[in-house]
Amino acid sequence: ARVATRNMAMSRQKKLDKMDVIELAKEKPKPEFNFKEARASGRYIFQTEDLVIGYDKPLSRPLTLSMERGQKIALVGANGIGKTTLLKSIIGEIPPISGKTTLGDYLYPGYFEQEKKYTDNVTCIDEIWKEFPSYTQYEVRSALAKCGLTTKHIESMVKVLSGGEQAKVRLCKLINNETNVLLLDEPTNHLDVDAKEELKRALKAYKGSILLIC
């Protein structure tokens, strides 16, 4: 009787193990990033003239730069040299110390911030609904799931998610807005391997312009 009971217990455990594996596979959706694209921009994305960036003190010498439609440019370098400050100065989020930036015509920019602090009691669903009020709940859930978020993540408050999961919520907004230029500040920083690979593929396929900090 003991052997039979033990065999039954082992049989039940095997079934449970199988169920666990199936459930885990189901609850790890593979991300699919397909950026919605706007009409083509003008020839120039931006031009800077003797731009000096910084806050209290200069972080750069005067920079005269330009970026044309279709270019994909990566800004590389050690932390703290001013890559994010340059990006924010170009888009007008912070004022330069001196010099000027001229933005091109017909720009539909999409900006991905490296870090964003979430403090409000807002679920992922509500966060996307704020951005896309015409979406149905099904469309909101579907958009978030395509970014690799599980049902549990989607129904959670954004502030309790991990850095990688919060990044996927921000990517969801970016992907579903029509853009022709992407300004990305270390977008792969907190992402898992699958999401990193999919984002690389999507950025290669993107027909617009890209300025990327990595």
Predicted regions and their residues:
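Extended, highly charged alpha-helical segments
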Residues: 1-36, 98, 133-135, 139
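ABC ATP-binding cassette signature C-motif
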Residues: 29, 35-214
